[in-house]
A protein has these predicted regions:
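Short, small-residue-biased leader/transition segments that mark boundaries at the very start
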Residues: 1-6
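Alpha-helical scaffold segments
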Residues: 7-183
């Protein structure tokens, strides 16, 4: 269910430099090494040290979001759900989970959601990551060295149903592997 996308995962928290090193060195496919960089930060003067996260391609942020954009999307969806279909108190938690899932599907997240997605990815198989309900986990899987060319080609049909911003990483990987022309 869509509401399961945002369920908080209890995973051991690593340092950001450790997470980045694993993503860029251990997991990233050789064809994209030096081209893809992961970025996350929290701002010490911000309430609760909120921050932002991004994935860069050759120094350009191709996917980025921050706490404030993420929270605005969550709150907008939550108030819409509470004013229409989920008015009773029993459905508040479901409305919150659906709101977080909706915001993530829209491509908005904060650094904490980014870290949680990595924790999920790092603690499950590539097969489970490719079909994860969390789109960030699917991106990590699409860029993973364990995903071979045959398997990448086999994903083509399922990518037609994928979120646009996730599909863009599939195209990037296909081009890097020489399986698709650069347009």
């Amino acid at each position: 269910a869509a509401s399961d996308v945002y369920k908080r995962q209890q995973v051991p928290m690593s340092t950001w430099s450790g997470i980045r090193n694993k993503l860029e060195s251990d997991y990233l496919c050789p064809a994209l090494r030096g081209h893809i960089q992961y970025f996350a930060t929290s701002y010490s003067k911000s309430a609760d040290h909120e921050g932002r996260a991004a994935i860069r391609m050759d120094g350009v942020e191709v996917l980025r979001s921050n706490y404030y954009t993420y929270f605005e999307n969550v709150w907008t969806k939550f108030t819409q759900l509470r004013s229409t279909t989920m008015k009773d108190c029993d459905s508040t938690k479901e409305a919150i989970n659906l709101s977080h899932a909706h915001a993530l599907e829209q491509g908005t997240f904060d650094q904490k959601v980014f870290y949680e997605a990595f924790g999920i990815f790092d603690n499950q198989s590539i097969e489970n990551s490719l079909v994860s309900e969390n789109p960030l986990v699917r991106i990590f899987a699409l860029l993973d060295r364990r995903l071979g060319k045959r398997r990448l080609l086999a994903l083509e049909e399922s990518m037609e149903q994928e979120l646009d911003w996730v599909r863009a990483f599939y195209v990037t990987r296909m081009q890097a592997e020489g399986l698709m022309d650069r347009e």
